[in-house]
């Protein structure tokens, strides 16, 4: 890459040496443990650093990828060019009135637990969702009958050119696993959840029940991206895959889970190519058997 050393030094000036990695294998930073190298991986510690990195990206015309905690993404084996940013240091969670405010890099499960500790109800559904707050907003994450849309008040974002703005719930076009931000690629910095006072014991009982359901049904013992496919109208993706006889099948180190057919696991050092080939096998087979097109919930990014 042209100016690679210069770009690295500028990134170090902005974020500090410990927060900038070069040629970093992204399999170290995704929950599925798959992914080629990123040219530069940066972890800003302040909103100002986020803005400065964005301006640097603009100055050099670099490709840019924002990654949450790597839970809902497959990075191809060729990796990611330019700058990859994770906001793991921006992870504060606090309360103002009945609102819980969280920075983008906080774990959505941690926000759910914080709400419980504060005797606030509304985020129980998120107690088992693997992902960052920013990722949860982008995907309008949901589970067990609840979704982000139900409790979101507003978000603070940075545009890709480095401008700050506030967007209200109704401006975010939150739908089933989609949002305006998933199309504009604005960077979520801070989120305000509007919750209600509740009974601690009742909130905890609901969270315990949802956690039990999740642990008993999902293959949490292996790396995965979580739920691979969106729910097709009138069907359940996992049931279609199960009825297609695909459990235990796959390519290379990737395999359709025998515990929950909606999950594809990294059973043995799978590559992105293995994982994507397994996805395509599932889609093709389900289409042939049932005439249903399975749409991806997971994002596939990076170079071949």
Swiss-Prot record:
Q: Where in the cell is it found?
A: Cytoplasm
Annotated Gene Ontology cellular components are:
cytosol
Q: Which residues form the FAD-binding PCMH-type domain?
A: 34-198
InterPro entries per UniProt: FAD-bd_PCMH, FAD-bd_PCMH-like_sf, FAD-bd_PCMH_sub1, FAD-bd_PCMH_sub2, MurB, MurB_C, MurB_C_sf, Oxid_FAD_bind_N
**Residue numbers annotated as active site:** 177, 227, 297
Q: What Gene3D superfamilies does the entry give?
A: 3.30.465.10, UDP-N-acetylenolpyruvoylglucosamine reductase, C-terminal domain, Uridine Diphospho-n-acetylenolpyruvylglucosamine Reductase, domain 2
The keyword Ribosomal protein is assigned to this record: no
Instruction: Provide the E.C. number(s) assigned to this enzyme.
Output: 1.3.1.98
Top-level taxon of the source organism: Bacteria
**Reaction(s) this enzyme catalyzes, per UniProt:** UDP-N-acetyl-alpha-D-muramate + NADP(+) = UDP-N-acetyl-3-O-(1-carboxyvinyl)-alpha-D-glucosamine + NADPH + H(+)
What GO molecular function terms would the record report? Answer: FAD binding; UDP-N-acetylmuramate dehydrogenase activity
Cofactor(s) needed, names only, are: FAD
- Which biological processes are named by the entry's GO terms? cell division; cell wall organization; peptidoglycan biosynthetic process; regulation of cell shape
Pathway named in the protein's UniProt entry: Cell wall biogenesis; peptidoglycan biosynthesis
Keywords attached to this entry: Cell cycle, Cell division, Cell shape, Cell wall biogenesis/degradation, Cytoplasm, FAD, Flavoprotein, NADP, Oxidoreductase, Peptidoglycan synthesis
Q: Which PROSITE patterns match?
A: FAD_PCMH
HAMAP family per record: MurB
Protein family? Belongs to the MurB family.
Sorted alphabetically, which PANTHER family does this protein's record hold? UDP-N-ACETYLENOLPYRUVOYLGLUCOSAMINE REDUCTASE (PTHR21071:SF4)
Function of this protein? Cell wall formation.
The protein's name in its UniProt record: UDP-N-acetylenolpyruvoylglucosamine reductase
